[in-house]
Amino acid sequence: MAEFKQQGPVCIVSGLLDQQTVRSLWNDRSSILAPETAALQLAEIEYCDSAGVAFLLELVSIFAAKGISLKLVSPSEQLKKFITLYDLNDFFIEEAK
């Protein structure tokens, strides 16, 4: 299961972000993050599959529809491999700046 911990404008995502978790989070996707969230810090994600990546990109899309830029920063080592494998580098930032 994934956990979302809000710390001001940053939300720290940890745990498992897989298909099963995404199914349980999907209906709340529009309200899972505080409106002031500017970045999702992903270093503590233990495992993320394609459904998890799609969920993260959906959160970015929801914020973009409101005219807000939501950044995906500091992906975990496991997530970095997935990002490289599927050429998703344009969507993620190595470290929070």
List the model feature ranges, each with a label.
Residues M1-A51, E58-K97:
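STAS-like cytosolic regulatory interaction modules
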